[in-house]
Amino acid sequence: SFYIYKNNYFINNGLMISKDINTDVIMNSKSVFEAQNNLYKILSNDEENLFNEYNSFKLTNLRVTNKKDSYSYEIVDKSSPAYLELTVNCFNNQLYLNCLKSLDNSKNIEIFNCFKVYINDQLLNCKLSNRFYENTDGTFPSTFNNGLLDLGSYSAEDVTIKLEVLRDFDITELSVGSMNIDKFEQFVSTKTARYSDLITYDNNLIYQASTNDNNQMLFLTIPYDEGWICTINGNGQPIESI
């Protein structure tokens, strides 16, 4: 079977940001959601956060040790269930579970199949959640996906996220992010209305026309990897990946 998904929030052009903006603040962020908030503020000129981050889990049958760059969770009584639990008050929010040990794929394997995820006491159905949540027994993580799991969108309710811990684990980031959907839709609407779709394609070349002054930086939504070369008005320009 084949599934085709449409991204209603795709911004198919470049965005202008101030030349004086320090993009290091994104790379030096302490968490995934902090990085997203810093990127959002740079692109939108909004001082408010796009995400609220929650990491104060209630522990049941668990002992946590704060290490230098990570946290170690140990099940106290191996014969009894162990849980991490928190409740988020939602009002038109999209929720994500952030579970990350490292950006190195080989290290993330160590936390695979550590949890079963429950939303309001209902086991998250792997076939109805997303394509990264693949194990038939409902455990997570199971496939490297930047450590994020889509928990769904909620209008006006309290949502309780409970993680059943299946074994001891070490982790760098464990949190739930709540995205303000209204704020995000407003951001996308503003950006898509401001910039015209002047992108053309020719084999392995992507062209975009835009007008800016010397005080702006062109931010492209095109995914970047090694091998890309950028020319502006025929002159080679360096690319900074953020």
For the regions a language model picked out, list residue spans one by one:
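Aromatic/acidic, Gly/Pro-rich catalytic loop(s) in extracytoplasmic/lumenal soluble domains
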Residues: 1-33, 122
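Active-site-proximal, structured, solvent-exposed surfaces of multi-pass membrane proteins
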Residues: 5, 11, 47-242
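General structural signal for secondary-structure boundaries
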Residues: 19-29, 34-35, 177-185, 201
